[in-house]
From Swiss-Prot:
Cellular component per GO, a single term: cytoplasm
InterPro entries the record matches: PFD3, Prefoldin, Prefoldin_subunit_alpha
Descriptive protein name: Probable prefoldin subunit 3
This protein's record includes keyword Chaperone: yes
GO biological process, one term: tubulin complex assembly
Keywords linked to the UniProt accession: Chaperone
Keyword Nuclease carried by entry: no
Transmembrane segments: none
Reported function: Binds specifically to cytosolic chaperonin (c-CPN) and transfers target proteins to it. Binds to nascent polypeptide chain and promotes folding in an environment in which there are many competing pathways for nonnative proteins.
One Gene Ontology MF term: tubulin binding
Entry's family note: Belongs to the prefoldin subunit alpha family.
Subunit annotation: Heterohexamer of two PFD-alpha type and four PFD-beta type subunits.
Coiled coil: none
Amino acid sequence: MATITNADPYKILFEQDIKTATNIPMVTFISNVEEFVKDKDVENVFKQLQEAYQKYKFFESKLSNNISMLTQRSKQLQESLDIVDHVENKSNESFSVQYELSEGVYSSAQVNEPKSIYLWLGANVMLEYSFEEAREVLRKNKDTVDRQLSESIQDLGFVKDQITTTDVNVSRVYNYDIIQKRKLKLSGKTEEEEK
């Protein structure tokens, strides 16, 4: 457990040694609010909690977008694997295909007894592969994408837990502040006199 230092009394909010694979820090649950806010300005604590909340919401958005992109990429790679299998099954015959030239623009082609297949590698690079080599390249890419997808899903779950913990911390500090202000009001002292 992290300890409060005199140099930065707000640093305890994060357990710096506990992070995910993507280096997202874990927020500390404030179990003893009175001890945590002692000798600190409550407004600064709120500010720090809000900053942490915004950072986690940013991570959540980034990870959600990443998951969406990786899911789409995984589907595309699976479709490519299915196409390689389909073309290989028709390697002893001629057939017609429609292919996409660019987004929304298609063309037809006649394929005569294919013995290999071409894969787009990106950056306007296309290479010819045997069916087995193409399958190997696509499977390797799909495995990498699926692993990244799994890690992103785990990180998103972690971030959602941190958002929940931060929300609870904000509520606990807010409630503590309200109780302290009520006590001051009942005692007849002002906040300035209490300090």
